[in-house]
Amino acid sequence: MEAANEPVNGGSVQIRTENNERRKLPNFLQSVNMKYVKLGYHYLITHLFKLCLVPLMAVLVTEISRLTTDDLYQIWLHLQYNLVAFIFLSALAIFGSTVYIMSRPRSVYLVDYSCYLPPESLQVKYQKFMDHSKLIEDFNESSLEFQRKILERSGLGEETYLPEALHCIPPRPTMMAAREESEQVMFGALDKLFENTKINPRDIGVLVVNCSLFNPTPSLSAMIVNKYKLRGNVKSFNLGGMGCSAGVISIDLAKDMLQVHRNTYAVVVSTENITQNWYFGNKKAMLIPNCLFRVGGSAILLSNKGKDRRRSKYKLVHTVRTHKGAVEKAFNCVYQEQDDNGKTGVSLSKDLMAIAGEALKANITTLGPLVLPISEQILFFMTLVTKKLFNSKLKPYIPDFKLAFDHFCIHAGGRAVIDELEKNLQLSQTHVEASRMTLHRFGNTSSSSIWYELAYIEAKGRMKKGNRVWQIAFGSGFKCNSAVWVALNNVKPSVSSPWEHCIDRYPVKLDF
């Protein structure tokens, strides 16, 4: 595989191949697999009964409001002579109401969240990165030049963070150092979350932690249970090896748990560990994560309690998960392995961008019927049917997702995918600003990047009541996952936001 001059991303990491066309993200809106359209409409029809009840209830309320006192008296007299029918209908109404209330999905609210801000002492500038890489003496001249070019074109700024163990010469990627990094990130985010929300940790009923490349024993979730003395019956989950899309997977899992367990809180912690996952070899396909991945993590508090609606920031509307792991190329395109010298790292396939495009296409095709206005759906469906039935060369209609969402949080895994999504979804620079600035300020923080992006939008004062947010992330496996939120209020940034002391400097102009 040839050295990269320009990074592109898929599943959190970037690479350039010899073939420029294969490197680019395919225009996934130009070809649509019908099974994903059907899946999206299946989700829509699942809620069709509830949608039909809305106009029926409106008509019923209107008619009742027109009744006079004489009308009500006549109805009462009629019921007196039909007591059996009255009792039967009353019982039926009570039974139907009970079944509806018991079976309807519980609302899931995002009370608050926090993103970890590392100390300034852990910041790494380009020159410091290159100087340390030379001093380590594990990299040859070709590898050093390759990393320099990746850094210059990556979209990362001069204020990203690396763990303390990698600031040492030589680095000390020990188990103890890796544990220390995870504790600093997770506990730092959780301390802020509990302080801001005034939640007692023992009130947490569900805990979900995701970290792709570091899975010690006891687990990261067990470390949190031990640190905050969570109650003995907490439902604890630890997700590993699921890549940069695992943050949305964790939200989806927590949502499902909150459907089962009433009146409880769920905490989701999304992080990655850099200390033990630095590559010290010379295989270019495995060097790119060194240039992109940086320290970061987030903690999110979810609730299914009705009383929490007033103080919550968002309500979860949809989660859509797409997995292409059944395809061998997709399964192998981001693969942790050892090189010829026994050095461990993440290897990237030259087909990675094409696979990312297929996963994205499948995901948004399923999501579309759930979120797009009916006018967009009709236009999209008509052009699709015309093309399928008449084998027409008619150019497919590209739905305008800007009509469905006010804000976009695209996983900040790399500059190239942000560029391609901006182009294919016809987004403005403002729509992708949060993703670009998060990549510049914090680098690729893996599954937590979408939360730094949401914090950026809030810090800019752009999140208004009723605004809809689309979080989209993708990662190894190969997976593409989406979460849709609606703002319940004009959202203000949380106390100790990661952008608190630098938001006035952004957006910055990026020159490549």
From Swiss-Prot:
Source taxon at top rank: Eukaryota
EC number, as in UniProt: 2.3.1.199
Active site: C244, H323, H407, H411, H440, N444
Phenotype caused by lack of the gene: No visible phenotype, but significant reduction in C24 VLCFAs and accumulation of C20 and C22 VLCFAs.
PANTHER family documented for this protein: 3-KETOACYL-COA SYNTHASE
Taxonomic lineage: Eukaryota, Viridiplantae, Streptophyta, Embryophyta, Tracheophyta
Keywords, comma-separated and alphabetical: Acyltransferase, Endoplasmic reticulum, Membrane, Transferase, Transmembrane, Transmembrane helix
GO CC, any one term: endoplasmic reticulum membrane
Pathway terms, separated by semicolons: Lipid metabolism; fatty acid biosynthesis
Induction info: Repressed by herbicides such as flufenacet and benfuresate. Down-regulated by darkness and low temperature, and up-regulated by drought and osmotic stress.
Coiled-coil region(s): none
BP-aspect Gene Ontology terms: fatty acid biosynthetic process; response to cold; response to light stimulus
Gene name in the database record: KCS9
Organism: Arabidopsis thaliana (Mouse-ear cress)
Pfam families named among the record's database cross-references: ACP_syn_III_C (PF08541), FAE1_CUT1_RppA (PF08392)
Enzyme class, first EC level, given as a word: transferase
UniProt subcellular location: Endoplasmic reticulum membrane
Single annotated GO MF: fatty acid elongase activity
Catalytic activity from the UniProt record: a very-long-chain acyl-CoA + malonyl-CoA + H(+) = a very-long-chain 3-oxoacyl-CoA + CO2 + CoA
Keyword Endoplasmic reticulum found: yes
Transmembrane segments: 44-64, 83-103
Name of the protein this chain belongs to: 3-ketoacyl-CoA synthase 9
